[in-house]
Amino acid sequence: MAAKDVKFGNEARIKMLRGVNVLADAVKVTLGPKGRNVVLDKSFGAPSITKDGVSVAREIELEDKFENMGAQMVKEVASKANDAAGDGTTTATLLAQSIVNEGLKAVAAGMNPMDLKRGIDKAVISAVEELKHLSVPCSDSKAITQVGTISANADEKVGSLIAEAMEKVGNDGVITVEEGTGLQDELEVVKGMQFDRGYLSPYFINKPETGIVELENPYILMADKKISNVREMLPILESVAKSGKPLLIISEDLEGEALATLVVNSMRGIVKVAAVKAPGFGDRRKAMLQDISILTGGSVISEELAMELEKSTLEDLGQAKRVVISKDTTTIIGGVGEKHSIQSRISQIRQEIQEATSDYDKEKLNERLAKLSGGVAVLKVGAATEVEMKEKKARVEDALHATRAAVEEGVVAGGGVALVRVAGKIADLRGQNEDQNVGIRVALRAMEAPLRQIVSNSGEEPSVVTNNVKDGKGNYGYNAATDEYGDMIDFGILDPTKVTRSALQYAASVAGLMITTECMVTDLPKEDKSSDSSSSPAGGMGGMGGMM
């Protein structure tokens, strides 16, 4: 086991604080409408330029191991805020830096660290309650546009595109961000349920000019099994042929004579048919087939439920207004499933999302939810260069997370004003002793830090502006973009309540742990033995010089 380097008390805390400040100082220059860019060097390719706090934080590793521990703990604040609300990483980092700096000053002055932490926690709990009272629901398109614009660093085009996407696919709809091919940002909306499976044979194509299969008012057969024997399918094929409607078959796989028979029937015009594989794998495939059956009002033919394909009738089949199948995707539009069945399935998936533990599971469940409830929107980001594209894509993703958070928990006045107002409302809060009171004051002072930094980044004097904002009431604040005072809601400067709340809670949580740190342990650097061996006279194969 490697030998350890151990530091105690003030010596440990000073080192840790130095690391906190290096990381936070790098992150906080990006805050606000006049925040600066940070250039990140890459081991290959062009450097990337960003104004995203968490992207800056992730890049920072310090040489001194004790300082690095401090930096990594603040990085954790940014990551947690990002995971919870998708935005507010810079605010969270700044709040943590302020609490740690003020808290460690108090510890150095002889205060009890545990009481300081209790005071900070008490202030944060009260502040979160006050934030909830200040919060205003965010439901209309204008408010969503404003939130998106602020989070995308005052890019109005991005804000309005996100609002348009949410309007089209609903608040639960999936909105993905992709790199576009042109200079302009574009919005593409896919209505209905789409999954990543294309036709099993190009002979099914009935629109050769576009290379797709289009079926109008088709029956949809869903089978959770491989189909290779054509005899199983004959009864249902005959029933569909009599009805005169087309047929879509979605199964685990379709091969051999079954596929050949379908192709021949389709080409001869006996029955208009197309076949695709079921989406997903394992249990997820079963769940997605069930989703499709509920959406289209049919049943999944499953051997687990003792159902046989030969005995299935037209009543077991789903129906839709239209199905479009390309080489890679299948889109079912206008399923005829019962509304209440679809709603109860949506509620069930929502419940599963709350209980899911892994991010991957949550993402897949959200996709299923969106496909059932509205559709999928794709935001294609346009830019002139690859460097700009990456920077812009990160901003658009931030803005998207922020608008989702705003719809979920509402909005408060932006520009750091909400936290200043909250601090004013709980200024009379008291702890059980003087050390706890100091902890409360540390938290209250930290709540001014975002406003001060926004002002500082815009080149004004933080103390003057902060005092002016404190003297105002309600949503009165400072618009750093235009250098004027007024109502922040009227200015369209809004922050999602969830983002502000998460930033404060995670910052206080990690900062509290750092204030109560008394000892730090890390590995001692290993001595490099290779330098000793290289100085030996023989130097490895050096004695073989005469062999050349």
From Swiss-Prot:
Taxonomy, superkingdom: Bacteria
BP terms from Gene Ontology: protein refolding
Main location: cytoplasm
Protein localization: Cytoplasm
EC class name: isomerase
Residues reported in the UniProt entry to bind ATP: 30-33, 51, 87-91, 415, 479-481, 495
Chemical reaction(s) catalysed: ATP + H2O + a folded polypeptide = ADP + phosphate + an unfolded polypeptide
Keywords for this protein: ATP-binding, Chaperone, Cytoplasm, Isomerase, Nucleotide-binding
EC nos: 5.6.1.7
CDD domains noted in UniProt: GroEL
Region (Disordered): 524-548
Biased composition (Gly residues): 539-548
Family according to the record: Belongs to the chaperonin (HSP60) family.
Self-association and partners: Forms a cylinder of 14 subunits composed of two heptameric rings stacked back-to-back. Interacts with the co-chaperonin GroES.
The protein's role, per its UniProt record: Together with its co-chaperonin GroES, plays an essential role in assisting protein folding. The GroEL-GroES system forms a nano-cage that allows encapsulation of the non-native substrate proteins and provides a physical environment optimized to promote and accelerate protein folding.
Protein name: Chaperonin GroEL
Organism of origin: Buchnera aphidicola subsp. Acyrthosiphon pisum (strain APS) (Acyrthosiphon pisum symbiotic bacterium)
